Amino acid sequence: MPYVNIKVTNEGVTREQKSQLIKGVTDLLQDVLGKDPATTFVVIDEVELTDWGVGGVNVEEYRRRQS
């Protein structure tokens, strides 16, 4: 019973994109590991830019510094 948790920043990932991610990950686990899609769980969490850190700062600040 595979469980995959995908975390992305909350920047407008569409319902269609989420569906594609879920299907793609499920298919990959079936193809590579022989896992049953009926018992494969995929969860997508959207994280606010201020709640995701990189380089010691949140993503908003990190991007400001990069530009």
Predicted regions and their residues:
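A domain-level signal for the structural core that forms small-molecule/cofactor-binding pockets
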Residues: 2-67
